[in-house]
Amino acid sequence: MKVFTFKYQKNPVGSAIDEMEHIIHAGLQKIKEDELICDSSEVINKIMSPSRLDLFVAIVERQPNSLYELAQILGKDQSQVLKDAKTLESLGLIELLEVSGEGRAKLKPKALYDKIVFEVEPKQVAKSA
């Protein structure tokens, strides 16, 4: 199961610098492409709005063949579904595949993760407050 994590952490820059120093001194390589660290819960909520979460869930569970089909599943306007899908694609959570067929090419959404996790470390938040 492939998991993407949104991590709420106060002072992520300071933590990232500390982690980078540890990695350099230990000779380790650590790049997490499946994690986004943010110090603002408002930003996380804006990035992963309820509409985008619903869209992600529908893609994982229903595996629609097009954005039109996804819009029908969600009962939403296709232009809004496209906008939200483009945001999820820019985050690396989904990809939009061009599928040719009758008429013009369609965009087929494909989930790149099976699960999204929202992580809060209360001790980290309290420590940096």
Predicted regions and their residues:
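A short acidic, leucine-rich amphipathic alpha-helix
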Residues: E69-Q72, L88
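A short, conserved structural fragment
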Residues: G92-V99
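Short, cationic-aromatic polyanion-contact patches
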Residues: N45-S51, S66, V99-Q124
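Short alpha-helical segments that sit at the start of domains
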Residues: G27-L53
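Amphipathic alpha-helical dimerization/coiled-coil segments
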Residues: D18-K32, D114-A129
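Hydrophobic residues on short alpha-helical segments
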Residues: L55-V57
